[in-house]
A protein has these predicted regions:
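Acidic, metal-coordinating helix/loop segments flanking the phosphotransfer/catalytic sites
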Residues: 11, 28-46, 54
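A short, hydrophobic beta-strand element within the central beta-sheet of small alpha/beta folds
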Residues: 48, 60-63, 67-80
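Extreme N-terminal starter segment of soluble prokaryotic enzymes
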Residues: 1-4
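Alpha4 helix (beta4-alpha4-beta5 surface) of REC/receiver domains from two-component response regulators
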Residues: 58, 77-105
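Acidic di-acidic motifs
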Residues: 6-9
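Two-component/phosphorelay signaling modules centered on CheY-like receiver
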Residues: 11-28
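CheY-like receiver
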Residues: 106-107, 112-152
């Protein structure tokens, strides 16, 4: 069974993640320090990190150093800057809390892409594009196209 670490400062998020990811072994941490300890002492197949409340980007650096793929989680509306920062620091994907009920299918897709050696970010950007288009003008796409993450 694949091991997942979910890090968030909201206990109700843990309940939802554990319910949605019932086919995985899920461990949770509610603070930066608790998550940091787990990241350096345990092994995970995937890490899910809240981007804001628990210093998720700092935890992302640790997860990447430990070679754990990480999905960034945010309660806030999509922000191309947060998406870009997450990608540049090594996250494999990004999801909003409003879409957390889709986390199981996202992880299945990510594990499949990682196993095949394919880009997780091309997949992620195709999934996020309609939401980003609705929130921002189409210019957000230019930077991602230059990086080879968009081909549409």
């Amino acid at each position: 069974m694949k091991r997942i670490l979910a890090v968030d400062d909201e206990p109700d998020v843990f309940e939802t993640v554990e319910e949605v990811l019932s086919s995985y072994s899920v461990q949770t941490a509610g603070s930066f320090e608790a998550a940091r300890r787990l990241l350096v002492t345990e092994t995970y197949d995937m890490v899910i990190l809240d981007i804001m409340g628990v210093r998720g980007l700092d935890l992302l650096d640790i997860a990447v150093e430990q070679n754990f793929p990480a999905v960034m989680l945010t309660a806030h509306a999509l922000d191309p800057g947060n998406v870009m920062e997450s990608m540049l620091r090594g996250a494999v994907s990004f999801i909003t809390k409003e879409n957390i009920d889709r986390l199981d299918s996202l992880l299945e897709e990510l594990f499949d892409l990682l196993e095949k050696g394919e880009s997780t970010w091309v997949h992620t950007m195709k999934r996020l594009a309609p939401m980003l288009d609705a929130c921002f003008s189409p210019e957000w796409r230019d930077a991602y196209k230059e990086m080879g993450l968009l081909d549409f």
